Amino acid sequence: MPQYQAVKGTRDIFPEEAARWKYVEGVVHAIASLYGFSEIRTPVFEYTELFQRGIGSTTDIVGKEMFSFLPDPKGRSLTLRPEMTAGVMRAALQNNLLSSAPVQKLYYIGELFRKERPQAGRQRQFSQFGAELLGVSSPAAVAEVITLMMQLFASLGLRSLKLRINSLGDTEDRLRYREALQLYFTPFHELLDDASKERLEKNPLRILDTKNPALQELVAGAPRLYDYLKDASLQDFEKVLFYLEERDIAYEIDYRLVRGLDYYCNTAFEVTSSELGAQDAIGGGGRYDGLARELGSSVDVPASGFAVGMERLLITMEKQGLFATLAPQGPLVYVIVQQQDLADNALQIVWRLRKAGIKTEVDLAARSMKAQMREANKIKAAYALFIGTTEETTGLYALKNLETSEQITLTLEAVLELLREQAVGEQLD
């Protein structure tokens, strides 16, 4: 066994899989741009208190899962980001983005870190993409980010996804509901696990998010938050549902859905895939009007957003066979060196081909012509260009189509022109 191994909870991504990541990222960039969202990139670590205030001190993320350390000269704890939304809001507030443009539409693709038990689709270092719509307080804004997310899934060809949605109401609604939950769960205090007992005092809504099988029946009998919503909250939620129906986006109201972060209010949603087993969430989000004030803003910044786990998305796509046609694309041409004393000349031709925008490969290991041809076919090159004494003497080069075996003889300039046209055609495809 090699002396050094990847750290538990991390993994290497090799070229074939990296091509899948690149494909998904390309679709994310395209659909986000279609909706008028611009990319933002924030630091991978922030002051720990940003997440304590933003995510919520009673959440599992803050209580158990953050990678925190103390290298700051002033003794302030730093944390590798466990989620993106708090950092995006911090960036918007710190840089006064909303004063120059009262509505900000931002999206991201980034690495995150949590101390979770490693399993399929859940690593300690993982990736998410998502979008945040800042500065708009309306059902239309929530519907906008949901529609963006669902169109993105559709563009990737995903099937059989379920959109679950609920209203968490406003602060007053949740305070009334909090009291109702405490009244309901307190008589069952001895049946609760340690985490739920702690949540009962600090934030009983978190009990509804428990994954403990022994508590599922008890949770199922709990009061519904929906029954504690005021008329304004109900109307807000119904308007979101109206927009989804107008756009033919199927949904299921899940009265137990609370999400795992404390900053959500009003609409919350989650998308699940049956391909992922018990841990079936592929992404989700909601509205978070109070986050800016939690981070020290003197004014409210209404906001809505979503995040999708890349690893879980890729697992779902793999299980649905969506990568079957995404074979790695080989070079357009493989330069075959027939005599090694011409290797330097061949490298000069390779440089000219690449400079012209033609994807070109060449053997750098001085292997036999037979081995070079075997490699050209293995990596699915479209053409082989032969460099030998005859070609150097006459200035005419043999170009072989490796799919049809048809071979033609051309000047180097004609080869460049032919392959350049092919390369442009591939880019247009």
Swiss-Prot record:
Q: Quickly give the catalysed reaction.
A: tRNA(His) + L-histidine + ATP = L-histidyl-tRNA(His) + AMP + diphosphate + H(+)
InterPro entries in UniProt: aa-tRNA-synth_II (IPR006195), aa-tRNA-synth_II/BPL/LPL (IPR045864), Anticodon-bd (IPR004154), Anticodon-bd_dom_sf (IPR036621), His-tRNA-ligase (IPR015807), HisRS-like_core (IPR041715), HisRS/HisZ (IPR004516), HisRS_anticodon (IPR033656)
Keyword Nucleotide-binding part of the UniProt annotation:
yes
Q: Do the record's keywords include Cytoplasm?
A: yes
Give the Enzyme Commission number: 6.1.1.21
What Pfam families does this protein map onto?
Answer: HGTP_anticodon, tRNA-synt_His
Protein family (similarity comment):
Belongs to the class-II aminoacyl-tRNA synthetase family.
Protein name as annotated: Histidine--tRNA ligase
**Organism encoding this protein:** Pelodictyon phaeoclathratiforme (strain DSM 5477 / BU-1)
